[in-house]
């Protein structure tokens, strides 16, 4: 007989799903796919099943990191209105259950990556999850205003892992993708921190606007935005992307600088930069895939 799933069961499933930080997972997964596709169009090949498994493992590993982060940050999540609706502060999931859930997903994702893909990808995935869950969440976030800068490396690993899943090595191309996300992270999160500086201060988190003030934060946002703009052109200069990427990256970068300058002039416009930065990363990495596909297609025709 079929058993009807109760409303309580569905709410529990939704709560566990929320622990994974699905919006973050979607962006992480997309950047990982970009790394894998770029490796493929660069002449490296791997079985489709292993590549698909790698992307799945990266998504699960990212979700595990999100769950472990929510476990450790449950005290400050309850203080901040932006995070107070998360499953643990709401009492939908116990801290112990969240911890076990995160650790199990972490172990399974790394083990499957090791068995079905390759050792390098498994090592990189384990480092990325550890970096975010322990180095950033436990040691950096509550201790230094540079938490986002140093901790930003965790979110920059996925395209490198995607590349390694196909190529089985770390190429210059994947390092540039890593650097793009690394430099994207500070202006993205500091824009949000400008909006919620009062809540961060109340929670005891030394975000840059809290420790150094609004003016210094706006200057840092602008500086990192300039560095991001320059770095986004590197793929074309290093000849692993073509003219299509160059044109789109240049335009996207100019718009990013426009929003960053607006924030520098008026911090109240910080959320426009925050929302655009998410769109920026999706479009930039999307055009990586498009450009690589177009270049390969043209090469076959010539």
Curated annotation (Swiss-Prot):
Database matches in CDD domains: PT_UbiA_Cox10
Q: Give the keywords, sorted.
A: Cell inner membrane, Cell membrane, Heme biosynthesis, Membrane, Transferase, Transmembrane, Transmembrane helix
Q: What is its EC number?
A: 2.5.1.141
Q: Name one GO cellular component term.
A: plasma membrane
Q: Which GO terms describe its molecular function?
A: protoheme IX farnesyltransferase activity
| Highest taxon of the lineage | Bacteria
Per its record, the protein catalyses: heme b + (2E,6E)-farnesyl diphosphate + H2O = Fe(II)-heme o + diphosphate
Location in the cell: Cell inner membrane
UniProt similarity note: Belongs to the UbiA prenyltransferase family. Protoheme IX farnesyltransferase subfamily.
Report the HAMAP family cross-referenced here.
CyoE_CtaB
Q: What is this protein called?
A: Protoheme IX farnesyltransferase
Q: Which organism is it from?
A: Neorickettsia sennetsu (strain ATCC VR-367 / Miyayama) (Ehrlichia sennetsu)
């Amino acid at each position: 007989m079929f058993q009807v799933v109760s409303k309580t069961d569905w709410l529990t499933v939704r709560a566990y799903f929320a622990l994974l930080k699905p919006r973050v997972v979607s962006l992480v997964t997309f950047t990982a796919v970009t790394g894998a596709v770029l490796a493929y169009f660069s002449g490296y090949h791997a079985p489709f099943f292993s590549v698909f498994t790698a992307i799945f493992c990266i998504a699960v590993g990212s979700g595990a990191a999100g769950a472990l982060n929510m476990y450790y940050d449950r005290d400050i999540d309850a203080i901040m209105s932006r995070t107070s609706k998360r499953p643990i502060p709401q009492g939908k999931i116990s801290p112990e259950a969240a911890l076990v859930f995160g650790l199990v997903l972490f172990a399974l994702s790394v083990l499957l990556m090791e068995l079905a893909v390759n050792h390098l990808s498994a090592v990189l995935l384990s480092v990325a999850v550890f970096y975010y869950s322990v180095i950033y969440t436990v040691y950096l976030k509550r201790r230094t205003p540079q938490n986002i800068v140093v901790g930003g490396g965790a979110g920059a690993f996925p395209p490198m892992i995607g590349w390694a899943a196909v190529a089985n090595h770390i190429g210059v191309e994947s390092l540039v993708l890593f650097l793009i996300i690394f430099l994207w992270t500070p202006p993205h999160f500091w824009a949000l921190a400008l909006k919620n500086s009062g809540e961060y201060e109340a929670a005891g988190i030394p975000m840059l606007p809290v420790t150094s003030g609004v003016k210094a934060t706006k200057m840092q946002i602008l500086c990192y935005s300039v560095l991001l703009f320059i770095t986004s052109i590197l793929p074309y200069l290093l000849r692993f992307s073509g003219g299509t990427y160059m044109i789109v990256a240049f335009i996207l970068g100019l718009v990013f600088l426009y929003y960053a300058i607006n924030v520098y002039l008026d911090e109240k416009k910080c959320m426009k930069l925050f929302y655009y930065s998410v769109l920026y990363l999706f479009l930039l990495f999307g055009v990586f895939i498009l450009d690589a596909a177009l270049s390969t297609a043209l090469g076959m025709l010539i």
